[in-house]
């Protein structure tokens, strides 16, 4: 049995992996830009990459910027993974150059056809030129078509200037001496529907619509069109878009003046499609129509087509799109790690230099990021935790912590494992889970070479080499490498001893933390490397930590078990924040 959409599904999954940087085994470097991809996919479509990967096992491939531009390669990469290729007069040359250099023959063929179309538009045949000009030779570069409505209701004849050309090159003008009641409508070849924009005459008194066109790109039907003014004094603008006509080369400049002499601002709109003009439903309604048009375009904000997220500036959208495209132009020169944004690289470099510019005024503790200082102050110096859960009234220091906690109540788990279908509330938890499938252990001890799946395991392990024991019993002074062993010590040795008020309060806090950890919080944790004032020992207990055990049929620890065994002794806000730091 053959599934018809299996190939599309496979390509879609591969593209999502590329955008997330998951299982990408090669990096294409073009100047400052880096593109993650899968070498088997590239080699399947490009003879260039096929030849390279037959002779080398290097992960990084450096391309010549003079031969392959970053924008052109990005479009080419999207075509390879999605089968979609959007060509226009702006990008076709870059895409063709990149495809020709990388030997992607299918794209080369498509680009050549498109370039021939554009060349035909720029240099039409003599037959078509003669049909436009008759016996008049056109050598000028631009042609100004001006359409004026004098709007004289008492006169039966209206003089309308249709075409004004350079007088030195000859007159190219036709005048209509009579008004016609019948309106002409022309079909757009793209939609097959009538495309008409009507402007009420009382709004368009003393109005002018200027169409600036390239004379060499002017098709015959445009000259033959006539602007009609009927008895109702409505100005109807109609246009025909030929298949060979580049609509993006047309700029409409509309100037509207009111009867009382108050002029409206000019609206210059560069259309990507002539049909877009007709898609606006009568923007010139009532006397404030000009303001309505301005508001229509001023309210339009950049939006991500993938997630629907709206941004205040186009530059913010461009930075955001790097996440989906896998573009990481900012590279650390010390370790080679790449980032999508400049501030991410700046923060990362501090892990090499040890710089901690944000200092706590109360305890002189330093932090690499400002958000860490804010969290420290709220957690340890009694500052307000402004983010409160509406369900359980638990308060958090950051909005992201509250958002993660809220998923405990809603049950939302947006992150799905594409291998087994298990769902998670946080991306980092999915990352840990995937490592169970792949066996990846990226955190390696510099002393003995032992590898771990999570950074907290490495931190606890490293204390065996350094002898550090940060967890001290306040009753007897014994110290331990992790808080779990400290709790065991208190239970066995000091369970019957007289407790001081401080120790009783601490035990009460620990018991509260235990009860919190017993709640279903298995997928509400995220771990990122950073600095924190909280103890960074997320204890593993013994060496045979569940995270390091292989998964078998008889023993398959759940993500809840794995994560709970990693962290002990912290309240829920601390757990969430620690997960975000690592």
UniProtKB/Swiss-Prot annotation:
Q: Is Nucleus given among the entry's keywords?
A: yes
Q: State the residue spans of region: Disordered.
A: 169-197, 489-538
- One MF term from GO for this chain? zinc ion binding
Motif Nuclear localization signal boundaries: 174-190, 257-262
Q: Does the keyword Zinc-finger apply?
A: yes
Q: Which domain of life is it from?
A: Eukaryota
Q: Where are the zinc fingers (C2H2-type)?
A: 302-324, 330-352, 358-381, 387-409, 415-437, 443-465, 471-494
Main subcellular location of this protein, as a coarse class: nucleus
| A GO cellular component annotation in the UniProt record | nucleus
Family recorded in the similarity comment: Belongs to the krueppel C2H2-type zinc-finger protein family.
UniProt protein name: Myoneurin
